[in-house]
């Protein structure tokens, strides 16, 4: 099986990478979730927010905000992530399609 070609950004706002990081809360078993989006060319953090839950709806809202804030045009950007639920959920994918953002996912390890 052939490996996919690596993603290479030649300038800012071409490829963003994002993930959700679990952060311990003040109470045992309580977590907060850091949503962080970074431009892979410039390493600029284009947005970060902390929430009390992890969801594809929140992910979609953040991407919509970022694209408006950064004035991203349809077909301009690739958004790379792992294969987590909030990254591949129907709401998130529909938002990406509406915005003209191309999703990219890490290859699953079998």
Q: Language-model segments: which ranges?
A:
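Charged DNA-binding/catalytic regions of mobile-element recombinases
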Residues: 1-110
